[in-house]
Amino acid sequence: MPSSLPTMILKHLADFKPQAATRAWASIPNPNNLPLIATATSDKSVRVYSLSNFTLHSKLEGGHERSVRSAAWKPGVRKDGALTLATGGFDTMMTIATGSFDATMGVWRRKEEQKNTIEDGPLELEIGADGRPNKGPSLRRGGDDGSDEDEGDDWEFSIVLEGHDSEIKHVAYSPSGQWLASCSRDKTIWIWEEIGDEGEDEFETVAVLQDHTADVKCVCWRKDDGNGEVLASGSYDDTILLSKEDGEGDWETIAKLEGHDGTVWSLDWEPDVSIKSDSSEESSVPPTPRLLSSSADMTVRIWSKMPTPPPQNKPSYFNAGIPSTMRPGPVNETWECTATLPKVHDLPVYSINWSKYSGRIVSTGGDGRVAIYEERTKGRNTVGGTIEKEWVVLTVLEGAHGPYEVNHVTWCMRYDNGKKKPDEEMIITTGDDGLTKAWFIEEDIEESKVEA
């Protein structure tokens, strides 16, 4: 019902300064509720910007010989409800992994004496039940322009991880921080585990996945739902593969998702807020998160796991009394495309992101458009039947970076002084023009005009 749709527009909030002089690939918000975002660029560096004032906080450079295509923050460590990031322990040091076209992955750490602080004390955030900080953090300020006075000296290039034969396209930490995955033009996915004692920077290759038949463009982790963390990967071979550890140290492909007619550029797992709103209160079985994908075929799709009926002679993995670590899992899962979002893009859709707060989806691509979608309830066709839902387009922004392609888009919490409510989100875009831009959402435009 179009009349019930909110009238909203995306408005430019700020450009992050200083911008890169060359192509900017992706901007990744800090997952530990710190007001920082890391932008990977083709000038061989990563710029860490402040989300509070949109200026440079620090810079990672000198570790790669070619373009840095991807960056990933290591998740923080939760202790008794607190997310502690700077208390002196190795696991609490800020860490960023970078993937480069030079075929190497780098691991960078924030030096001990220059960790984020509130005044002179450690930065410790109390995390509420909704995953948000009870008190917003503030970062040590640098120069008068808001940048870090010790730029270039505050991140240590700790270790180089080698193994790929060609350009690394994407890197990602698992939600637990246990695994670090990288994918490459060489058609492989490498999975690493940090095994050294505190501060030793020792990594071990635990798996090399070779089931894709072409360039692997992206990887995305699903958090452990009791059956282990799952890695989704998208490729130039037009397919999506799901892989997981079998409980004995071996990694295997558990599902192959087919349906796209072009390169799979981006993936994202459904957040908890969307799962809860979509699940039945009567069901005792937690639903499996859906998977979001975008492609060169100009579509954005949602995939769902199909129920697998237990066989007549139930194997041990159906016995809930046996710990999951002792039960072999089923080899294959069946996934189907259960929704295709309304068509917005005329060129490849390079990036998508599913908001963990609102459940809305944002997409962008080669046509420079940024689109926001929302899932709506349609109702039931029959009494007592299944509730039907549909995805609608809330707004489309044309030419977000002028004539340039937009390579990446992400939802991000607002930390600047202009936010109007504590849980307000903004959208960050990253483009071929070297710019990283922040956008805010203005809703109910017509209604606000009437009230004025």
From Swiss-Prot:
Coiled coil: none annotated. Keywords: Repeat, WD repeat. WD repeats lie at residues 20-59, 63-118, 163-202, 211-253, 259-313, 344-383, 405-449. InterPro entries: CIAO1/Cia1, WD40/YVTN_repeat-like_dom_sf, WD40_repeat_dom_sf, WD40_rpt. PROSITE patterns: WD_REPEATS_2, WD_REPEATS_REGION. GO terms for cellular component: cytosolic [4Fe-4S] assembly targeting complex. Pfam families: WD40 (PF00400). One of its GO terms (biological process) is iron-sulfur cluster assembly. SMART domains: WD40. It comes from the Eukaryota. Residues 112-153 are annotated as: Disordered. PANTHER family: CYTOSOLIC IRON-SULFUR PROTEIN ASSEMBLY PROTEIN CIAO1-RELATED, WD40 PROTEIN CIAO1. Belongs to the WD repeat CIA1 family. This is Probable cytosolic iron-sulfur protein assembly protein 1. It comes from Sclerotinia sclerotiorum (strain ATCC 18683 / 1980 / Ss-1) (White mold). The lineage of its organism: Eukaryota, Fungi, Dikarya, Ascomycota, Pezizomycotina.
